[in-house]
């Protein structure tokens, strides 16, 4: 049962606590968040890099509008699918929200499965300056005029170590690296080597992480069921509406989200009329006038669903790895585990089930 067997008589959760409920996709963390919200003590902060996008509802398993009204979430529906939102943006927004929630006499409850965000909160980010909007506009103009391959070649000259790690298709990171260099005169790899600064190092706050790592076979069944429900609820049509309502590029972070990426690939493979509204690396995609029969569409559709399922399981696999790393880096000391005393300002406990995490947290309220 993870750490839960070793926890005895834990102290009450202090007023300066920041609680982080961390678990893989489809593991049931949202339901627990709702129960905690109903105690009247918590405000929910979403830790999900897909829920930030407006109009991306079905494929992200976003809470319904009625749920969001009953259980308000911070950092949900905050940008359009055409926009970008960095880890640094998330940390900055979270810092402000944590302070505001504490001022209201409540406890921040961070809930979600974007483990990169949690790693930034617990382990810190390199002190990379924010990009000047004018520099960003200049680099974007370069990308549109020269193409991403030319920018990658440029990056290999100014920051060879980073260029080796980034594939040509990683538009977001390539442009970000060039923005940093053009603004500071130093390569991004230089900034990444500097000491990191973590929001959770604030001595005035107590950060409590609950890392839930359920049985994988059980989780795989939950993932398969969730995807079946998404397709039935109109996920494919949702992507069509996004392409109709927004000027989207297949390389935008929103369209690289699991599920959305596989639908885009299907549209391209079947020469779907919607691809005329899509761009790839800034270049328009034209219909080829292919005659795609129903049998081919059916095969391509099943392939899309299989790939979405596989990609979601791979996402969960990565989430387990990140969770284990967080626990290894911030697990409680032996003294804390046996006494239950709160002697550390930042700690991550591991649990095998959401129910175990629930029992532990409610014992501290």
Curated annotation (Swiss-Prot):
Gene Ontology molecular functions: ATP binding; tRNA dimethylallyltransferase activity
Q: What is the lineage of its organism?
A: Bacteria, Pseudomonadati, Pseudomonadota, Gammaproteobacteria, Moraxellales
Q: Which UniProt keywords are given for this protein, alphabetically ordered?
A: ATP-binding, Magnesium, Nucleotide-binding, Transferase, tRNA processing
Q: Could you identify this protein by its name?
A: tRNA dimethylallyltransferase
- A Pfam family hit: IPPT
Subunit structure, interactors included = Monomer.
Q: Which reaction does it catalyse?
A: adenosine(37) in tRNA + dimethylallyl diphosphate = N(6)-dimethylallyladenosine(37) in tRNA + diphosphate
Intrachain S-S bonds: none
Cofactor dependence is on: Mg(2+)
What biological process terms from GO does the record include? Answer: tRNA modification
Q: Which organism is it from?
A: Psychrobacter sp. (strain PRwf-1)
- Per UniProt, ATP binds at 23-30
């Amino acid at each position: 049962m993870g750490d839960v067997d070793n926890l005895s008589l834990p102290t009450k959760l202090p007023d300066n606590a920041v609680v982080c409920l961390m678990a893989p996709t489809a593991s049931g963390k949202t339901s627990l968040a709702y129960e905690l919200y109903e105690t009247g003590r918590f405000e929910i902060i979403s830790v999900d890099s897909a829920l930030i996008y407006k109009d991306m509802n079905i494929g992200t398993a976003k809470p319904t509008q009625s749920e969001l009204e009953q259980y308000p979430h911070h950092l949900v529906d905050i940008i359009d699918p055409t926009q970008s939102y960095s880890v640094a943006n998330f940390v900055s927004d979270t810092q402000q929200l944590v302070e505001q929630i504490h001022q209201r006499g409540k406890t921040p409850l961070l809930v979600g499965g974007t483990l990169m965000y949690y790693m930034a909160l617990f382990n810190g980010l390199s002190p990379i300056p924010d990009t000047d909007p004018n520099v960003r506009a200049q680099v974007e103009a370069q990308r549109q005029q020269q193409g991403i391959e030319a920018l990658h070649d440029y990056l290999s000259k100014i920051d060879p170590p980073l260029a080796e790690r980034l594939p040509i298709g990683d538009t977001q990171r390539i442009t970000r690296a060039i923005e940093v260099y053009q603004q500071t005169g130093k390569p991004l790899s230089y900034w990444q080597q500097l000491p990191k600064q973590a929001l959770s190092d604030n001595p005035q706050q107590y950060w409590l992480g609950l890392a839930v790592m359920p049985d994988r076979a059980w989780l795989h069944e939950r993932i398969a069921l969730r995807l079946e429900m998404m397709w039935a609820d109109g996920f494919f049509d949702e992507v069509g509406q996004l392409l109709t309502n927004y000027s989207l590029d297949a390389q935008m972070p929103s369209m690289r989200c699991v599920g959305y990426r596989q639908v885009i690939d299907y549209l391209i493979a079947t020469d779907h009329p919607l691809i005329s509204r899509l761009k790839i690396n800034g270049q328009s995609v034209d219909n080829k006038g292919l005659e795609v029969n129903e049998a081919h569409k059916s095969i391509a559709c099943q392939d899309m669903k299989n790939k979405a399922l596989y990609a979601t399981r791979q996402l969960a696999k990565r989430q387990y790895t990140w969770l284990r790393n967080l626990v290894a880096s911030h697990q409680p000391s032996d003294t804390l585990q046996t006494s239950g005393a709160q002697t550390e300002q930042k700690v991550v406990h591991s649990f095998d089930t959401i129910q175990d995490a629930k029992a532990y947290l409610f014992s501290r309220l």
